[in-house]
Design a protein with these regions (language model features):
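Conserved phosphate-binding catalytic cores of ATP/NTP-utilizing and phosphoryl-transfer enzymes
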Residues: 82-113
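Short, structured loop/turn "capping" segments at alpha-beta junctions
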Residues: 110-114, 134, 155-163
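N-terminal glycine/serine-rich phosphate-binding loop of ATP-dependent small-molecule kinases
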Residues: 1-81
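Acidic-glycine-rich active-site phosphate/pyrophosphate-binding loop
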Residues: 71-82, 120, 157-165
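Gly/Thr-rich phosphate-binding beta-strand-loop-beta motif of the actin/hexokinase/Hsp70
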Residues: 1-23, 103, 110-133, 149
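Active-site rim beta-loop-alpha module in soluble metabolic enzymes
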Residues: 139-198
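Short, charged, surface-exposed secondary-structure boundary motifs
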Residues: 36-39, 82-86, 145-150
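Glycine-rich phosphate-binding loop signature in dinucleotide/nucleotide-binding domains
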Residues: 42-45, 106-111, 198-199
Length: 199
């Protein structure tokens, strides 16, 4: 049974999986030792952990995992992956290569893959039909865009909760920001999809 920890820029996602089946999942701003200990106690069959962090590595958490589990794999530029990588691995975020490997392992052979991850940033990764990771692009995420509009303008408010709107154009500032940011991301994603389809 595997403990999977994905420490992102904003949220730390934790999952327990067994032979490809999701058993439990959690989300924390940061995983404390108490929370990690509780997860380990709740799932005594855990024997391995996979740890990925885009931020600084939590050495205390890694130490706990190493003490409690037989195998701990930290995703970094040295970890072996089942795809050819046409990218400087030392400069590639562990979250990005983990997303590529996850998508590649789930997809049928011989098809091009566009792997999209929406978080603080939106990442677009391209895997060729021959299974070579060709690289990718990074764009601001939804809430990064909202924060930027608020921070870099004098009068636009910070919107915390986006609401899906039916209309194409807003009739208030709040609607204009919500629709503009959501539709901007949607069109950006659709543009990448069309580009990959055309290859």
């Amino acid at each position: 049974m595997n403990l999977i920890i994905d420490k992102g820029n904003t949220v730390c996602k934790v999952a327990v999986a067994d032979r490809g089946e999701l058993i439990a999942h959690y989300s924390f701003p940061q995983v404390s030792l108490r929370e990690a200990g509780s997860i380990l106690a709740d799932h005594p069959a855990l024997d391995a952990a996979i740890y990925s962090s885009v931020a600084s590595v939590d050495k205390t958490l890694l130490s706990l995992l190493t003490e409690q589990l037989s195998t701990v794999c930290m995703v970094d530029e040295r970890v072996a992956v089942p795809v050819q990588v046409a990218y400087d691995r030392s400069r590639l975020g562990s979250d990005r290569i983990a997303a590529v490997v996850g998508a590649y392992s789930l997809a049928p052979e011989g098809v091009p893959l566009l792997v999209i991850d929406l978080g603080t940033a939106i990442t677009f990764e391209y895997v060729s039909p021959s299974g070579e990771y060709m690289g990718g692009n990074i764009s601001p995420g939804l809430y990064t865009r909202l924060k930027a509009l608020n921070h870099f303008t004098s009068r636009l408010p910070l919107i915390q909760d986006l609401e899906q709107q039916e209309q194409a154009f807003g009739q208030t500032t709040i609607e204009a920001i919500s629709i503009g940011v959501l539709r901007g991301v949607i069109h950006e994603i659709q543009g990448y999809i069309e580009e990959v389809k055309a290859k």
